[in-house]
Structures are given as structure tokens and as C-alpha cells.
């Protein structure tokens, strides 16, 4: 029994505008949002999960705890990705990376950070264009998600962890301490689909270290939970 990562949800003031930006950057396709309240993008590669842009009036108050690392096969590709993102409405963003950084830090039109990684990066060499979801988090939360998704650890050193689906796609990484304090609800969150009995799966996740949120189940029977670091995610039947 397990859960499947089916979507990364992104809160947006203007879901359609933000979806158009990411269509242009990633080359993904618009797709039906089966839950009806957002705009979905479907991957055209082995990423394995959709993006869901959900309407929200909440303001962004801090750096996101998760961001995309986009890969490059050549310096020219890195330059092209950056230029395309800027033309679509992105901007350069300073997170303290310094002038010698070989990756480029950008933000989308609503301020969500992402990186365009330099060519020759060995850690992401086997990954596609979406190389990683790079996250702020503990070693324990990396272990939790490895067990929850049944994805193997592909990195576990100096309190940094990374997992990757056996079917390929991006890595999900957690950088270890120091941690950025969590303020409010995360703008980026996972949607999981239960394979089999949803209540049994909820119990399994709780046994691994998750907790149920205080809110009641949603209209489709979905249940919001938090991982050991307090990050919200939703389990759908």
C-alpha cells in the first residue's frame, strides 16, 4: 500500500497567468483539473506529476520552502531558459547567492523562486529539464517522504537527503539545517492519491510521522495532513 505523488499545488493570485508562464518555461500542456478549482499542467516528460495552480488571496511573506531546479545541457541552454523566463514575466532574484554563483536564481510573476542550473551539474545529470524540487527541510522529513512514497534515498549525507521515483523524473531534496522559519501555510504543497483504502493509508502516514490537520475532509473526501516538518499536503481518495 502506498500513495502516489500526483500534483504539486501552487497558490496564485492569478492562476491562469501563472499557468501560462510555466507553460512557456516548461513546455508542458494545459490539462483538466479533476478537482475543478484550479488550472492544471501535465508534463510532457518523465516528471510524473502535474502542476495545479489554485486561487488564493494570501500574500507571499517569505521565501518558499520548495523551488524548482531546472537543468541545462549546455551554457547556451541555460542562457536560453533564463531569457525565455524573463520574456514571459519572470525576473532575477537575489537570495544571497553571490556574484560567483554558476546557477541563476529567478522568480516567476508572483515571486516564486526557481533556479536554472549550470551545464555539467553532476548531481542532476540523470534528471530531465525539471531536475529537482529543492526543499528546505530536515533529514527526518527526507526519511518520511522516502517511506511515504516508497521512493529510494539517492542522497543521505551531512543531514542532506534526496529521493527519486524508481520511474525517473526529478529528485526531491532537503537541504538540512539551518532551517528557514515557517510562517503560515506553504504556497507549494503536494497532492497525493491513495492507492487502496484511504483510511488505512492515512493511518500508515501517521505511523510514519505525519499528522492530520484540524480541518474536516473536503468535498471529494480529501484530507489535509502535515509532514514531520509541518509542511501541509493533501491525500485524495
Please describe what each predicted stretch is:
Residues 1-34, 41-94, 107-158, 163-216, ...:
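Glyoxalase I/VOC metalloenzyme domain signal
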Residues 99-101, 218-220:
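Short, small/polar residue-rich loop motifs at catalytic or cofactor-binding pockets
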